């Protein structure tokens, strides 16, 4: 099955799977995926226990060439929305973290075998 035949939802799910594996390789533990509330959705919530950091990750998956301006995809409005969602999620947790971080992970699935990953840490 070629990458071009993937639906948007399948492409997004594939990208999130790649992102979760990438975070695990960095020593981060995924706490939640596709967490939703009435105000929106957080793609991945992960924890870096070594530094007491909780990381809210926005995943952007692209097929074909180029990342299409990954940094530009995360507008100040989007960062504000992620912050608001993060606050709602945090309010429901028993645990407390010393540091909060917002990351963006771009995943490009092309004709090559391995997806390419760009990880922008601390965008917000």
Curated annotation (Swiss-Prot):
<dbReference type="InterPro" id="IPR011856">
    <property type="entry name" value="tRNA_endonuc-like_dom_sf"/>
</dbReference>
<comment type="similarity">
    <text>Belongs to the UPF0102 family.</text>
</comment>
<dbReference type="InterPro" id="IPR011335">
    <property type="entry name" value="Restrct_endonuc-II-like"/>
</dbReference>
<dbReference type="Pfam" id="PF02021">
    <property type="entry name" value="UPF0102"/>
</dbReference>
<dbReference type="GO" id="GO:0003676">
    <property type="term" value="F:nucleic acid binding"/>
</dbReference>
<protein>
    <recommendedName>
        <fullName>UPF0102 protein MSMEG_2508/MSMEI_2448</fullName>
    </recommendedName>
</protein>
<dbReference type="InterPro" id="IPR003509">
    <property type="entry name" value="UPF0102_YraN-like"/>
</dbReference>
């Amino acid at each position: 099955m070629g990458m071009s035949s993937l639906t948007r939802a399948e492409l997004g799910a594939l990208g999130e799977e790649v992102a979760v594996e990438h975070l695990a390789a960095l020593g981060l533990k995924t706490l939640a995926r596709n967490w939703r509330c009435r105000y929106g959705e957080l793609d991945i919530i992960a924890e870096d226990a070594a530094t007491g950091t909780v990381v809210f990750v926005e995943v952007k998956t692209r097929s074909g060439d180029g990342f299409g301006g990954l940094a530009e995809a995360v507008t100040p409005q989007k960062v504000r929305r992620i912050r608001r969602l993060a606050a709602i999620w945090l309010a429901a947790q028993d645990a407390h973290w010393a540091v909060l971080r917002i990351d963006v992970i771009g995943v490009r699935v092309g004709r090559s075998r391995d997806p390419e990953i760009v990880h922008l840490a601390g965008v917000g």
